[in-house]
């Protein structure tokens, strides 16, 4: 009898704790398509600055949720996401050595969630569909532009020496003081599965924020989480 009671407690206690809060890891597939941009040309004859195209992005991060407020849950997650592209520059003096660069963004999301539908096996497992809305903050590597390059060439974009421009431009764009900072809102919907103290989630999120993805006012992402209860 004692063994039977003990086995019930071992099962019930972690499950109860799991309902209070949880944490874990998160991976994401950013859904975006950034076209190649060519600056200069007709506006500045003999000068061309090209930022290459890229499609989608991979992200990784961590999350924390709290489930002690009636009706709603609160989530906080941090995520780094990125992809690579090339930067090229040409002026009448010569061509800059191409820069293999990374579009990268570090994101923080605060989300209020509400269950849409749920079912459970007492003390063992649960599943629920949910939706949520929230606020987000971003720090993103900048995109090279004509003004940026002109300043690095000492104000002479037509006749400036480009031999060390690739190093100077990369140093400028990777300096955190020059990152673009922005914020916005998002909505998401997904499925969460719980088994004892383990949880997994699969959800779609749409982020509405400027100055994150070049020339876009928002982007989508598919996200997967795996975590534990506390």
Task: Label each region the model flagged.
Residues 43-51, 93-102, 172-177, 209-216:
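Extracellular loop and loop/strand-boundary signature of outer-membrane beta-barrel proteins
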Residues 19-23, 58, 70-74, 123-129, ...:
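Outer-envelope beta-barrel architecture signal
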Residues 36-38, 81-86, 177, 182, ...:
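Predominantly the C-terminal beta-signal and adjacent terminal strand-loop region
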Residues 19-67, 229:
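Short glycine/proline- and aromatic-enriched beta-strand/turn motifs that initiate or cap beta-hairpins
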Residues 54-60, 102-108, 127, 181-187, ...:
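Residues that define the transmembrane beta-barrel architecture of outer-membrane proteins
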Residues 1-22:
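Cleavable N-terminal export/targeting peptides
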Residues 27-31, 63-152, 230:
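Gram-negative (and chloroplast) outer-membrane scaffold detector with strong preference
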């Amino acid at each position: 009898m004692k063994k039977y009671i003990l086995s019930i407690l071992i099962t019930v206690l972690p499950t109860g704790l799991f309902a209070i809060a949880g944490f874990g890891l998160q991976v994401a597939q950013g859904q975006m398509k950034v076209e190649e941009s060519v600056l200069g040309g007709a506006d500045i004859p003999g000068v061309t600055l090209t930022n290459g195209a890229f499609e989608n992005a991979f992200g990784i991060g961590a999350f924390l949720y709290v489930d002690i407020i009636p009706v709603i849950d609160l989530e906080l997650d941090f995520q780094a996401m990125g992809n690579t592209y090339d930067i090229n520059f040409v002026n009448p003096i010569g061509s800059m050595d191409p820069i293999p660069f990374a579009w990268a963004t570090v994101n923080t999301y605060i989300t209020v969630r509400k269950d849409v539908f749920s079912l459970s096996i007492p003390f063992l497992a649960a599943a629920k569909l949910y939706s949520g809305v929230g606020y987000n903050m971003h720090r993103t590597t900048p995109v090279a532009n004509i003004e940026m390059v002109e300043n690095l060439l000492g104000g002479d974009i037509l006749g400036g020496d480009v031999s060390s421009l690739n190093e100077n431009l990369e140093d400028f764009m990777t300096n955190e003081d020059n990152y673009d900072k922005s914020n916005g809102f998002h909505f998401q919907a997904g499925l969460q599965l719980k088994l004892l103290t383990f949880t997994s989630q699969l959800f779609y999120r749409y982020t509405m924020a400027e100055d994150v993805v070049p020339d876009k006012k928002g982007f989508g992402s598919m996200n997967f989480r795996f975590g534990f209860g506390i």
